[in-house]
């Protein structure tokens, strides 16, 4: 998710016109039609899109319901995703008490002074009246569970970690800078992300994960979860608009056979090492995305990154679309029990189909507007 997904500006002109036949075989693995400012326009654009699948992320508390409405109007194309983005988790209370803390109690504890943790941040007094009322994490997880159970094909997303984000100043504070100096503590982000991942594991749903300025924190979080025998290897995680280095990507792939990577030109394409990064990804783990909320631009954005992959990997259009089509299908599958999340080789898949005799494997995003 990025501030740019409100802007139709493209990072570079396409080298050739978008081919509707190819788009129909592709899935936009991560986009934000729920954030489109015009709901009816989003419905119209989703319906006219040539893409085969639009993976519609939720991000805030408010747009979980909008995601459902988009899916209800276009069930053949929209794949709904539910979750809370790290930009919107500061209202969640980790308290085990059944009573929701007051606004002052919650935010005073969440945003302490950098010089005296027993005191609130000096910036909090001005922002406090504009911050959303607290909500227990347990209550949000109940809503997340209900949404996923009501939509058996839904994914968990967008969730993750973001060490660049600062709480925006409200429009009422017009004389202030765009963003405050308040940052949701990493420990809070990790707790919320991990809680949502555990819901995904329990319900066997795949995850779309956001990571900005937090490559090693993300690696450590995923490694800790992988170390527990709770079914993590059954589900897949998509590291969306991946902005880490090629070296980090290789590290993640080695440690997490259930990890996929989706790329957008609007975010990933900013990196001077973008093509090197695309080449560092196992061909079986590549996905494409737009990360856009302007639904009229989804096709163009996905086509743009499709062309970049063709160029970086020296693939023909047909080879590229075949790989991406297969990868998306594999991403949506659950891994068999006991595989540890390892992708099956072509040989293993051929053997599974054969008769069996009887018995005797960093770019950052900016804050929202």
Model feature map: region roles:
Residues 1-12, 303-369:
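Mid-to-C-terminal alpha-helical segments outside catalytic/metal-binding sites
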Residues 1-82, 88-93, 97, 142-145, ...:
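An N-terminally biased module of ancient metal coordination in phosphate/nucleic-acid-related enzymes
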Residues 84, 88-130, 163-182, 302-309:
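Active-site gating loops and adjacent loop-to-helix segments of metal-dependent hydrolytic enzymes
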Residues 245-255, 270-280:
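Short loop-to-alpha-helix "cap/lid" segments that border enzyme active sites
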Residues 256-271, 292:
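His/Asp/Glu-enriched short active-site or ligand-binding loop at hydrolase and phosphoryl-transfer sites
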Residues 284-299:
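Short acidic/histidine-rich active-site segments
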